[in-house]
Amino acid sequence: MTYNLADLFESVADTVPEREAVVAGERRLSYAQLEERSNRLAHHLAAQGIAAGDHVGLMLSNGSEYLEGMLAAYKLRAVPINVNYRYVAGELRHLFDDADLAALVLHRRFAPSVAAVARELPRLRRFAVVEDGSAAPIELTGAYHYETALRSASPRREFPPRSGDDRYIVYTGGTTGLPKGVVWRHEDIFFAAMGGGDPVQMGNVIRRPEELPSRVLSQPLVALPAAPFMHAAAQWLAFHELFAGGTLVLTPQGAFDPEAIWALVERERVNLLVIVGDAMAVPLVEAFEARRERWNVSSLVAIASGGALFSPTAKARIAELLPGKLVIDGLGASETGQLGRKANTGAATQAPQFRVNDETAVLDEAMLRVEAGSGRVGRLARRGHVPIGYHKDPAKTAATFVEVRGERWALPGDMATVEADGSIRLLGRGSLSINTGGEKVFPEEVEAVLKAHPGIADVVVVGVPDPRWGERVVAVVKPCAPGAIDMECLRRHCAPQLASYKVPRDLVCVDELIRSPAGKADYRWAREIARRALLSSVA
């Protein structure tokens, strides 16, 4: 047995085969059934020519098929690749090509988007289509129905030996806004982000992979990850729970539905609800406030956020509405795994502050640890179990993963300081990226699209604090002439080229943008202009 993620899952499935692993709509799968379906998919992919090292894309909403796709790839020593189903043609084309996809598992409703770019990618000629109730046309050469493929494949666990050195890749936004693949070893991601065999996170990780079955909880934790599996934090939560013998309750496909989530919490006796910051917390709170007698959520122990931090306002509303429940902020990144967490049972009014272990530090410009209580600001960093680098991007790898005095550190780009008690206070991204509802938006990418509009002479894109989304994307524009651009024109221009969350929500027109002699935009000035304009619009 190794630290390969498939090996680890199989050991848990053999320990609690009849325990419920996944609840997804009407489908309820035990660990044995999830294992069998994953085996069938793996054998089918192998028959299609997928082998060790090949990349298999997953363009799916949350469902058992997403987990089956990941496990099937791991069983073959192949690599599952997360695909953001909100991407439009240009973004999909880049990701499919950059990730070297050899196969794609997708929900039927995404088939037209895939067909629009697949013909340009000769390597991608295998498509497993999961039915989702839509009638979207399937115009993909090499497409086949997912369930039909499973029925015709072997359920046996018959695969070559695997390794903890096998690859795990998760795609995230890059410095240009285009997605970049972060490459991990299985062993490293298991310890950095998936619990390390320590289900209650008390620092008692396993020393050998054979120990994992002994760490399976006698009473399973029931977790509901409302965040999509196409993001790292949701994947990590899912495998953390599976490696502990927990039960995953998955949300219905389609738009985010707060009432449906509360109904699932009640029906399935959910203990842990995991969401993405205020973008999900606010509508959940509003739905519960409107009908607080409707749902019995006494089983709920904690509400956690991954991908975006809760605002103090959201924490206060949750604490008032659900007294005694833990409200947990998670600290981490695709380049570091989980770094720490902060839990409250009441309102939090100060900046995010986290307890971390000795593998996490704040490093100054000389790459020395920032001393506790010094007040100095540095870059958040992690050593030990860190990624290999970025897929096909040696320059970014060298900039993000650095060796300091014989130790390799990951520097994800967050700025922080160390409090007198040793806790880390997070100050924000060192880059210009905007975090809106847990999604990263990079100004340069949006600006490039906007600058192509004939009515825009110059533009800077910034993030402005927003009570629901964390930040909202705002375009500060110098129009070519008065009235040359408005929000409707802007939306129409952006829609075919950008995912919806990247499209600016607000437009602020100015006579001139401030730039340096070298042409660099003054983002601080633009952000303040945008903030004032939005405040005056609601005054």
What role is predicted for each listed range?
Residues T2, E18-G63, L67, L71, ...:
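Conserved AMP-binding/adenylate-forming core of the ANL superfamily
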Residues F190-A226, M230-L272, R291:
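Conserved AMP-binding/adenylation subdomain of ANL enzymes
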Residues S30-A32, R167-G203:
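Conserved AMP-binding A3 loop
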Residues A47-Q48, A78-R151, G483:
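Structural core segment of the AMP-binding/adenylate-forming
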Residues M1-Y3, A135-D166:
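Flexible, low-complexity linker/hinge segments
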Residues A153-Y171, G177-L178, V183, P213-V222:
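Conserved pre-ATP/AMP-binding loop-to-beta segment of ANL
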